[in-house]
Regions:
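PLP-dependent amino-acid enzyme catalytic core
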Residues: 1-481
Length: 481
């Protein structure tokens, strides 16, 4: 969505922004906060990272400085060989330092903002509905609040307690649906029901089909990875691989950016082994919150994948205990993992562990050495999963920690991985038909365009440039800068 829809509604959005002291950042500023006006940087010094203040829209970036409250370099962590067991260098971008503690505020920024600046969303009458299995609705409700827009969250009742508490704090309407992480159809069904009941009031912002989701990662996350690579590479080291578990497939938009910059990169999409939709056309429930929803997202560019992999949720649950208990951390130090790394392991949430395991599996599968660099992300931190940690119980011992370290980290294997041929990629792409054409109203023509139009994804993902023009015009008319 890149052109004006309704000038009268646009004027209402501008007036709401003026009343609520709202200034919208551009994608360019989120990628490079040095472009943020000094007056806004000065305001941010007195505003907390999670505060419900509209200026925190400018903190939707990988470059928040947790020490000063200003901006700095990309927040990331390199995992040493003593921890991973592989020679390849693995870098993890850290989502903990975004507002809400997750980079999902980026994925939810575009769908709502693109409508506000084109007059496609009336903040005085309409509500933004965020269907989700986790952090997406948290980020969406947060951005809605900052942008002066009422919100609705639809998510499975089995998600962590921390998610529901946060949504209540934001005043969102909350509709829990039956099931857990992979029960996305129930979320879709409730969303459809609410939309039919309140067609004029509700605007559905579905992360699985909104191209502004991967567009944000193409414009912001991909360049952040490139920046870290250029800073950290030594000698003949090369950017070899990207591993990302996929729920909505938004983060994989960074892979489209990296493919343009580094054509030989290998990109692997991960999912829970207990719900191997991409790997085996499979299904099932699992415990890796935020990924694997028993369908192929509309916004997944299957052509850009080289590999898919299944990550055992049992491994992830064992490793969060290893990383977040006194016994586990003591064991890691004894095994030579630097204390500086050990003290930061709480920056890795459950899906982050899955990403790290996937990166290790890729390093082993392709027999990578010290000249290879792999990137992944930590969507969030353990701050959002303390209830899950408590559910695992107490009484964790050093012996258990040693077993978990050897079995799940050092013992990570190359099973449940598949390199993709042309027809493997097309098989994954064709699975979109059953969710999106049969159930969600998309057309076969749209589906085929995604596959056969070689320029389709480039045009979609570069839409942020036009959106930036509209944001600047919107801010000019609001008149606060």
């Amino acid at each position: 969505m890149s052109e004006r829809v309704n000038d009268k509604i646009l004027e209402k959005a501008i007036e709401r922004a003026r009343e609520r002291n709202i200034i919208i950042p551009t994608y360019e500023q989120m990628r490079d906060p040095s472009r943020v006006p000094e007056s806004i940087k000065e305001e941010l010094r007195g505003i907390g990272l999670w505060d419900l203040h509209p200026r925190n829209l400018f903190r939707i970036t990988w470059k928040n400085d947790p020490e000063t409250g200003g901006f700095g370099g990309v927040n990331y962590l390199e995992l040493p060989q003593e921890l991973t067991g592989v020679k390849a260098r693995i870098f993890v971008l850290l989502g903990r330092f975004f507002p809400t503690g997750s980079h999902k505020v980026g994925a939810t920024f575009g769908p709502l903002v693109s409508r506000l600046v084109t007059g496609a969303f009336d903040p005085t009458k309409q509500k933004a509905l965020w269907p989700s299995t986790g952090n997406y609705c948290r980020g969406g409700a947060y951005n809605s609040y900052l942008l002066g827009c009422p919100s609705i969250a639809v998510l499975p009742e089995g998600m962590s307690r921390e998610r529901f508490e946060w949504l209540k704090k934001l005043g969102a309407e909350i509709y829990p649906t039956p099931g857990v992480e992979s029960n996305v159809k129930e979320v879709f069904d409730k969303t459809k029901e609410l939309k039919e009941e309140r067609p004029e009031e509700i605007v559905v912002l579905n992360q699985f089909e909104e191209f502004e989701n991967p567009m944000w990662h193409y414009a912001v996350t991909g360049p952040a990875m490139e920046e870290v690579y250029l800073k950290e590479r030594k000698g003949g080291q090369r950017l070899t691989a990207l591993f990302l578990t996929q729920g909505s497939a938004g983060t994989l938009g960074s892979g489209n950016y990296l493919r343009e910059r580094f054509p030989s990169i290998r990109i692997c999409a991960g999912e829970a082994l207990q719900c191997p939709t991409l790997l085996y056309n499979g299904f099932g429930a699992h415990r890796i919150e935020g990924i694997g929803d028993k369908h192929v997202p509309w916004i997944l560019d299957a052509r850009n994948l080289d590999m898919v992999a299944g990550i055992d949720d049992e491994a992830c649950m064992h490793i969060i205990r290893l990383f977040n208990t006194q016994e586990g951390r003591g064991l890691l130090r004894d095994r030579g993992v630097p204390s500086e790394t050990v003290e930061k392991l709480d920056l890795l949430g459950i899906s982050s562990i899955a990403n790290i395991l996937g990166a290790i599996k890729m390093a082993k599968y392709y027999e990578m050495d010290g000249d290879d660099i792999i990137f992944t992300v930590a969507t969030d931190s353990m701050e959002l999963y303390q209830s899950r940690l408590r559910e695992l119980g107490s009484g964790y011992t050093e012996t258990q920690a040693a077993c978990d370290f050897e079995r799940y980290l050092k013992g990570a294997t190359t099973d449940f991985m598949a390199e993709l041929s042309y027809w493997d990629r097309k098989r994954i792409h064709n699975l979109k038909y059953f969710t999106w054409v049969e159930q969600q109203g998309k057309s076969v023509e749209e589906l085929n365009e995604q596959w056969y139009d070689r320029d389709h994804w480039r045009k979609k993902l570069n839409g942020y440039k036009r959106t930036d023009e509209l944001i600047r015009e919107f801010n000019r008319r609001v008149g606060l800068i």
